[in-house]
A protein has these predicted regions:
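Primarily a LysM-type cell-wall glycan-binding module
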Residues: 436-473, 478-493
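Short acidic DE-rich linear segments
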Residues: 1-3, 492-493
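Membrane-lipid interaction segments
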Residues: 2-443
Length: 493
């Protein structure tokens, strides 16, 4: 017997590939001709970032840059800062995907080593890890209506990553040093911390407002070290096709190539600090919706053969933003006399084995007991127990300070916000097809059935191809499962 049925198409963007790619690069760098020779290296760091990530011909094409920052002493014991920018590209096979597939990537720096060849040339080895995420549209057919049948329906609020867009922000700002400062000779090192603070979504566009903090260590006119801090706001309107007010957005900002220059002036002030360069912004949008799912079904007074499809999604979803604080001890090998420069940046954030793991990179330049300038950096992790997973996240450092707690120990106090779109991973078996294999002969008007405790009324009704509502009414059952062992009456159809 052919049944009249109607079908619905359930669609979702599945994470079809999540891959970490470790990359090691070696470079030989030479300072610009106008810079002094390298006598002693104090600080050599690098950070890598993505400039584009696209899918073509079953491959993900990733392009990016690595900025190398070098602080060194010249022959006159003056501190000099310079930087180098190198390109990189990676091609990753992702298999067969549809034209709806999209991807994005993030970078986590691992380490940077150097070896001096001579006073004009230095070998630099940089290592970092790219995390690639590829999403593709998956759909499955689900029976929505069927004649003379009972369908087990459930409405669930589900969510998936809807899109991911990478865009570039150009920045250019100037800051005047206080008039009572002793001027500025040259920049020694700096750190820029940027984070999104607000997003507003309209049709096909997202407005991202962000805050930037600039920390600069510089030498003054007496060739002594001094510090300056500045904060400013930036904003960007990003075109994101398909996004609307029903979506949520996680905006992740990453430093690109940034340059900080010192400028002396004849005016009555201490000088000017200029910052210019670029940032890269990844907007990951998440869409949630109420979805009607049919888990099971049967035809009254007939045996059926059912087919099911697996549907993976995130359920019980919400945008979670919470504030935290941590105290992290920074252990040194040498005794510390004075902290010259300290900065804290988010390094990585992930959820593994029901734990939220947030890593911070702490960078410290200090004067030791032997009156030498030292630089060290360490990665510190903070763990929290969680019961959910996130589709996307961002860490925002709101403040940090430090205390010298021992001759070789610094205690760093960090306040930060975690913002993520969280939920529970779910996998459902969806009723995709149902066919009659045999029509049953009519049952007696009533049939006795010895039901067990916790047995589902649905399973009993399906077993006898009877009407579940009639069974509940006949036996005064209000719940979906039996609370005790019970003899019940099964109405015939």
């Amino acid at each position: 017997m052919e049944l009249e049925k109607e079908y619905s198409c359930i669609e979702n963007n599945d994470l079809v590939l999540s891959k970490n790619i470790s990359i090691d690069k070696s470079y030989q760098e030479t300072p610009e001709a106008y810079l002094d020779d390298i006598c002693k290296v104090v600080r050599c760091t690098s950070h890598s970032y993505i400039t584009s990530c696209d899918i073509r011909d079953s491959c993900a094409y990733i392009m990016g840059k690595t900025e190398i920052c070098l602080t060194y002493f010249n022959d006159s014991d003056e501190l000099i800062y310079t930087d180098f920018v190198e390109d990189f590209d990676e091609t990753v096979e992702i298999g067969n995907v549809s034209e709806n597939a999209f991807c994005y990537a993030t970078v986590c720096d691992k380490y940077c080593n150097y070896r001096m060849i001579n006073q004009r040339r230095i070998d630099i080895h940089s290592s970092f890890c790219i995390s690639l995420y590829v999403y593709d549209k998956k759909s499955c057919s689900c029976i929505s209506k069927c004649e003379n049948s009972k369908l087990q329906l459930n409405k669930s609020r589900i969510a998936c990553v809807d899109n991911a867009v990478l865009s570039k922000l150009d920045i250019e700002e100037s800051f005047v040093l206080p008039s009572n400062s002793n001027g500025i000779k040259r920049v020694v090192c700096f750190n820029v911390e940027c984070c999104s603070v607000e997003t507003k979504i309209i049709k096909d566009k997202i407005l991202v407002k962000a805050s930037m903090s600039l920390y600069v260590l510089y030498s003054n006119n007496d060739n002594c070290l001094d510090r300056a801090e500045y904060s400013f706001d930036i904003s960007k309107i990003v075109d994101v096709p398909g996004v609307d007010e029903a979506c949520h957005c996680i905006a992740k900002l990453c430093n690109g190539s940034l340059f900080v220059k010192a400028k002396s002036t004849d005016e009555d002030n201490g000088g000017v600090i200029d910052i210019y360069g670029d940032l890269y912004l990844t907007c990951v949008t998440v869409r949630e919706k109420m979805q009607e799912l049919v888990f099971d079904g049967y035809v009254l007074n007939a045996d059926t053969s059912n087919k099911y499809s697996t549907f993976n999604c995130l359920s019980g979803c919400e945008m979670s933003c919470r504030s935290n604080s941590s105290k992290l001890n920074f252990e040194l090998q040498n005794e510390i006399v004075k902290v010259e420069f300290l900065c804290v940046t988010p390094h990585q954030c992930s959820i593994k084995n029901n734990k939220l793991i947030v890593e911070f990179e702490i960078c410290l330049m200090y004067t030791g007991k032997d009156n030498t300038l030292q630089y060290v950096n360490q990665i510190k992790a903070v763990e929290q127990n969680v019961t959910s997973v996130d589709l996307a996240n961002d860490i925002r450092i709101t403040s940090f300070d430090y205390t010298i707690s021992g001759d070789k120990t610094i205690c760093v106090n960090i306040s930060y916000d975690y913002c993520g779109y969280c939920g529970n991973e779910a996998s459902y078996n969806i009723l995709s097809e149902m066919e009659i294999t045999q029509e049953r002969k009519s049952y007696p008007a009533l049939t006795l059935y010895f039901a067990k405790q916790n047995e589902r009324v649905w399973d009993i009704a399906k077993q006898f191809s009877s009407d579940i509502e009639m069974i509940k009414k006949e036996n005064n059952i209000t719940g979906d499962c039996l609370e005790t062992n019970k003899v019940i009456l099964i109405p015939g159809i």
